Amino acid sequence: MRTVVWQSLSEAQQESILERPAITEGANITAAVAQVIAKVRSEGDAALFELTEKFDRVKPASLRVSREEMDAAAARLSETMKQALEQAYNNISKFHKAQKAQPIKVETMPGVVCEQVTRPINKVGLYIPGGSAPLPSTVLMLGVPAQIAGCRKVVLCSPPPIADEILYVAKLCNIDEVYNLGGGQAIAAMAYGTETVTKVDKIFGPGNAYVTEAKRQVSNDFRGAAIDMPAGPSEVLVIADETADANFIAADLLSQAEHGPDSQVVLVTPSPVLADQVTDAVQKQLKVLSRASIAEKALASSLIIIAESLTQAVSISNYYGPEHLIVQTRNPRELVPLLDNAGSIFLGDWSPESVGDYASGTNHVLPTYGYTRTYSSLGLADFSKRMTVQELTADGLQLLAPTVVTMAEAEGLDAHKRAVTIRVEKLQKAQ
């Protein structure tokens, strides 16, 4: 990790060191994904079987995972694993249930009533990546809010063979439409539908460059599907003072660095002594990590920033807008009102990022790459939509009519004006 003193940098240099590396998917990926999407749209299930065999080197007997297969997966899991997943499920459920929107009903003026009601998105698709280790935590983070929101159809796709842990959590979340599908072909199938796979309205979940590009392409097509949020590399920023535990900070930085070589890891502290201690602790802990080579690549482009004060550290963090923000200071709670841009915040010595990744109850699907300025952590609202309702009495319309008529005339919209005046005239004749 490179250490810099913030005050010694020019404004241009400060902006430069906080600039994230460009995400370049490349023309090859864009074209390849477009071909996959076109093939799935034209050939349906046949394309899904062909592409699954080509990319995943698996030839599933069926695209859809049966209820019997899901029950068998549950039976194979250890009780310890089941209990851990159930505890995480309960915590995540509790936090997301608290997010339920309450109906709003306001009389804005006599006889004019406005309401806001919330409805679930009808059909949603969840993408769960494959890889060397299963990701049941991602199923929890997507499946629980979909379940609580009341989405009528929830479709889950994951590359075969699907891990028992993933199938067990799908069962916990009452997801019974699970498919042996990965990559861009899974996104295309959910976005457009096939003979077997249900077309959904919105797609959630992380993935590799091909999945990310497929989500981008289908979200730009009005015939496709909406998506959760833009994707980017994982990142963490730690604000710490001289009271922080250097070993804790090193562990938190490394837990993010092991995600991938493009992960962003930043420590901001007013204490040069702590900065040196963290540098030493990172090197010691790195030696015992199974993914040390990956973490080392991420650390090579990571930073320790020496700030003048915690106030300046907060300013740096707000400018950067990290996905994960850890605050290890003497009074971390006092900084919360000053923090504007972060996906999820972890306060104090006993709140490692890992708890949010798995089981504290918050959602680990977070905006990254600076999108925290405008996007929020995933929650119940993302699986819902708002509708407004207005109802006017005859007296209410007559009271509001002059305002609407004046504004419609100013905008040159005569039909808008007439939709009001024709009613007012009828009321006046009846008097």
Curated annotation (Swiss-Prot):
Keywords: Amino-acid biosynthesis, Histidine biosynthesis, Metal-binding, NAD, Oxidoreductase, Zinc. GO terms for molecular function: histidinol dehydrogenase activity; NAD binding; zinc ion binding. It comes from the Bacteria. SUPFAM superfamilies: ALDH-like (SSF53720). Pathway: Amino-acid biosynthesis; L-histidine biosynthesis; L-histidine from 5-phospho-alpha-D-ribose 1-diphosphate: step 9/9. Gene3D superfamilies: 1.20.5.1300, Nitrogenase molybdenum iron protein domain. Catalyzes the sequential NAD-dependent oxidations of L-histidinol to L-histidinaldehyde and then to L-histidine. This is Histidinol dehydrogenase.
